[in-house]
């Protein structure tokens, strides 16, 4: 268990805890002007009941992961966060008190917000917000049976994107797809003609802090794929992924990009 639940910073480092960048000192919570605080925040006493809890994760200004945890409750609570197993002790957090309308009835709610630079977060890791009684100071490995928790998977920082580039002479094409949760299967086609798999190579870059997977596929045109006029020379890249719907991305080259002979 940790010591005092009143805030401040830990003096004993934890080997597997997330570590912030020394430059990340912003903070929107006026209660914590230094932008650093424990992952535990004590809130006032409110009526007893099992709180309702909602959790959302989004990207803020491209560089930050922002998680927001809303707890509807009238009881005294300690709110804390975990990313994976470690507690989130050193990143910018803030709690605000507000009232929400639920079925036309105003309810008391607490909103805890966590901001972490994406470079300190590995996408697809579980993030958890826990609302615990004030007499329980939860930490790493603490039993959370008496807490109300909500977990979700941290998404990729951005939406999946696919770009196709042509060489100056038009005899090579490169397809780069980013923000992938795992390596997909790629097929190339020109018009309605599917190209043989022995004509291209691909490189996979796995998930890293702040970045989901990237697949780079390169195709060299070694023979004409068929009698196609310039308006029909459309490159299609089809990526199939087990956990995502099938996505088809087409590239319509400008006249200066069109190969004279494929």
From Swiss-Prot:
It is found in: Virion membrane. InterPro entries: Varicellovirus_Gp2_glycop (IPR010278). The keyword Membrane applies. GO terms for cellular component: membrane; virion membrane. The keyword Membrane applies. Residues 1-45 are annotated as: Disordered. GO terms for biological process: viral process. It is a single-pass membrane protein. Keywords: Glycoprotein, Membrane, Transmembrane, Virion, Virulence. Virulence factor. This is Glycoprotein gp2. It comes from Equine herpesvirus 1 (strain Kentucky D) (EHV-1).
């Amino acid at each position: 268990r940790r010591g005092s639940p009143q805030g401040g910073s830990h003096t004993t480092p934890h080997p597997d805890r997330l570590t912030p960048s020394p430059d990340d000192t912003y903070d929107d919570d006026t209660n914590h002007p230094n932008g650093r605080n424990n992952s535990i925040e004590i809130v006032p006493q409110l009526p007893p009941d099992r709180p309702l809890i909602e959790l959302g994760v989004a990207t803020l200004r491209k560089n930050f992961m922002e998680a927001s945890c809303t707890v509807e409750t009238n009881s005294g609570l300690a709110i804390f966060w975990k990313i994976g197993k470690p507690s989130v002790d050193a990143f910018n957090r803030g709690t605000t008190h507000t009232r929400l309308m639920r079925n036309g009835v105003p309810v008391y709610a607490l909103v805890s917000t966590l901001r972490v630079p994406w470079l300190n977060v590995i996408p697809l890791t579980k993030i958890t917000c826990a609302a615990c009684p004030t007499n329980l100071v939860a930490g790493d490995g603490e039993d959370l049976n008496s807490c109300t928790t909500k977990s979700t998977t941290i998404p990729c920082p951005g939406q999946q994107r696919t770009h196709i580039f042509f060489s100056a002479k038009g005899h090579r094409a490169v397809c780069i797809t980013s923000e992938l949760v795992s390596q997909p299967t790629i097929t190339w086609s020109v018009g309605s003609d599917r190209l043989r798999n022995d004509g291209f190579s691909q490189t996979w870059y796995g998930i890293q802090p702040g970045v989901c997977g990237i697949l780079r596929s390169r195709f060299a045109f070694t023979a004409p794929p068929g009698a196609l006029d310039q308006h029909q020379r459309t490159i299609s890249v089809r990526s199939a992924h087990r956990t995502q719907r099938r996505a088809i991305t087409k590239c319509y080259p400008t006249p200066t990009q069109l190969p004279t002979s494929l």
